[in-house]
Amino acid sequence: MSEPLHPAEVRVLGALLEKEITTPEYYPLTVNALVNACNQKSNRDPVVNYTDEVVQQALALLRHKGLAVRISGSGHRVEKYGHLLGEKLNLGRRESAVLCMLMLRGPQTVGELRGRTERMYEFTELADVEHCLESLATRQPDPLVAPMPRGRWAQLLGGPPDPVAAEEPSAPPSDLEHRVTTLEREVAELKQTLESFRRQFE
């Protein structure tokens, strides 16, 4: 990336990427849905409280950089937004999952990434995650991730990582966090089931 992204741009782009993979039936997203995705308290670090205006400004910048697109017209009563990160950077599913999680949660260890990307891509073992990270770190002309102290990795779309954040150990996932993640997965599966059921009667 020739120009580092602002933190709001990173969060918006990460949220779009996450929702495309985990809840494709609701993608692309309206501004309101995207605000909620950016501000959700689970699976986010730091937790933010963006306004519609902040998200719309980030979208405008991302569109200017060719990383986001506005979708309107037939079939869409309101304007929706999608990302072009995969096309722009030639990312596969596993690279997208790892980069997305680093964008949404900041620097993480290989083990944390393997667990937290489960809904997006199921890595068989830690070595697979390491191989993916090494591939992203050696991208030319611009690496997308970089290794950090304490065995963690950071995304570089927003520029070099904060040295203070680099020294802070990542907190282990709490039992509550695990339960929330499980519930989110179950809700997403229920939504898909209900949507399939509804389509049978259309």
Language model features with spans:
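Extended, charged alpha-helical interaction scaffolds
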Residues: 85-132, 140-144
